[in-house]
A protein has these predicted regions:
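Short loop/turn segments that flank or connect secondary-structure elements
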Residues: 1-143
Length: 143
């Protein structure tokens, strides 16, 4: 069972989770949402670490998402795939991880309707496809 409770807990840093990585699809979706060119969106809201584009981190936010305001996602309808697929990430589909971390920190676990195995598999596929896309779009600096 899972239903998002809108707690914003998945958007705050707990030291074990880091960047919100962005695929090309995510970048285009955000650019459209903000009515900015890709270049302008990247300049205003992104950083590159180890060749990967991710949402910028601000020191004053202590690792929390830049789009989290009053425990609410201000870009929910255009949120990136990494956020859309939470908590059904491939890395989380381990009973130990799920029981020790995910179910403890995500109040939506165990709430709402039962999510079918078919739906979970679709989400896992989206997560995997996004990871592949992000890896393929890595920016390798010239030496």
């Amino acid at each position: 069972r899972f239903e998002c409770q809108g707690s914003g807990k998945c958007c705050v840093s707990r030291d074990s989770y880091g960047f919100v990585y962005l695929s090309n699809i995510d970048l285009k979706r955000f650019s459209k949402f903000f009515k900015l060119s890709l270049k302008a969106f990247k300049k205003k809201y992104c950083q590159i670490t180890d060749g990967f584009i991710h949402l910028a981190e601000k020191d004053e936010l202590k690792g929390n998402c830049i789009f989290l305001k009053d425990k609410m996602c201000t870009v929910y309808k255009s949120r990136p795939s990494q956020c859309r697929t939470w908590p059904f990430w491939n890395d989380n589909m381990n009973t130990k991880v799920w029981n020790k971390d995910i179910s403890v920190n995500c109040p939506g676990v165990g709430k709402g309707k039962l999510i079918s195995q078919k739906k979970i598999n679709q989400i896992l596929k989206e997560d995997l496809d996004t990871e592949k896309s992000i890896l393929k779009s890595r920016i390798i600096p010239l030496k």
